[in-house]
């Protein structure tokens, strides 16, 4: 899995894996894996759009670095629409594979594979898969990922959709870094929606890592995203906390 040919084969395979719009608590995945790391993660996001109910979502997860190149995580996901009560939404199993060592190639590469079992069985189950890329320019870190998503055994027509996520950050200090993030969905991977129907958001973001002693670290990142297309929410606030030990 450490050669460009193998990485390219995995990337091409994602095109043939038989997405929904990015949720307000979605995050930008990075390709690195820490062997032996244990993690408790909290995510939250809320999005508003004129004429629609506010949508909020959150999750709690436990993850573990099983090998130097494989990190696995189990999520319990919750959501709330408008004034309705918060409800359990889904169980998700996420796996991240580091495909190259930092600096081994022009870009660092990884692969994300997620399987989700929605509480509403009419939604079937969901698979999301795609390559992760990172490139550093001195103190500036850039990430770009494109992800394919599809529901199986659902009551709705099954379509493979294409989404993306990106971020740029300046590593000013470990405890405080700043930059920008963006998320988007273009519709079916082989027949994109009209521009007015696509969802694109972007906005400023902050990041940081606070040492707690020993191997214990508290990481955070948060972003305030604004619509960059007609179909996107007007504003989205998202945040992520990770306690690593």
Predicted region positions:
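Transmembrane beta-barrel domains of Gram-negative outer membranes and organellar outer membranes
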Residues: 21-245
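Cleavable N-terminal export/targeting peptides
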Residues: 1-28
